[in-house]
């Protein structure tokens, strides 16, 4: 299996929305809303609103045999406009997701490594993310150098120096 990584293009936005749904509703159970319902949640809408129009927006798409299977992006937020994982205006928040059929195959690691390298080249010094405490991706984030910064009852805000 060969995983290809590429900078996102405007045409990738529908796939990024799919991946955002996969990331937010990662638990595959009977409580998972439909894609249409989940995509309408205010926090989900906010995450990709006006994507690519803000300075610093950066994303990567992972493909296998030209089929998109995962994506990640980071974005800067403000104290008046932010998503979970926000720390301050100088620390972009990372969002990552891999289609459930392609998890546990190293795709998440490759995506994070690519984005960290991109962040280094862009002069970014830190990156944050939010993860539920029971999300199996927590171990991936720790392996990739993210550390718990704050304990938010059911989730952690994590921070990584770049």
Predicted regions mapped to residue ranges:
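Conserved acetyl-CoA-binding loop of GNAT-fold acetyltransferases
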Residues: 142-152
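Conserved acyl-donor/pantetheine-binding loop and adjacent beta-alpha core of acyl/acetyltransferases
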Residues: 63-96
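Conserved acetyl-CoA-binding loop-helix of GNAT-fold acetyltransferases
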Residues: 95-98, 104-117, 142-143
């Amino acid at each position: 299996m060969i995983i290809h990584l590429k900078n996102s293009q405007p045409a990738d936005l529908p796939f990024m929305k799919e991946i955002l749904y996969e990331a937010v509703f990662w638990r595959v159970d009977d409580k998972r809303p439909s894609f249409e319902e989940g995509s309408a949640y205010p926090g989900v809408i906010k995450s990709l609103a006006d994507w690519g129009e803000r300075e610093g927006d950066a994303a990567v798409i992972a493909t296998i045999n030209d089929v998109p299977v995962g994506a990640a992006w980071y974005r800067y937020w403000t104290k008046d406009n932010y998503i979970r994982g926000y720390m301050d205006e100088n620390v972009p928040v990372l969002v990552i997701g891999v289609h459930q059929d392609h998890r546990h195959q190293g795709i998440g690691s490759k995506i994070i490594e690519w984005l960290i390298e991109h962040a280094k080249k862009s002069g970014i010094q830190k990156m944050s993310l939010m993860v539920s405490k029971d999300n199996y991706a927590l171990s991936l984030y720790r392996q990739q150098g993210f550390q718990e910064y704050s304990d938010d009852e059911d989730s952690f805000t994590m921070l990584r120096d770049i």
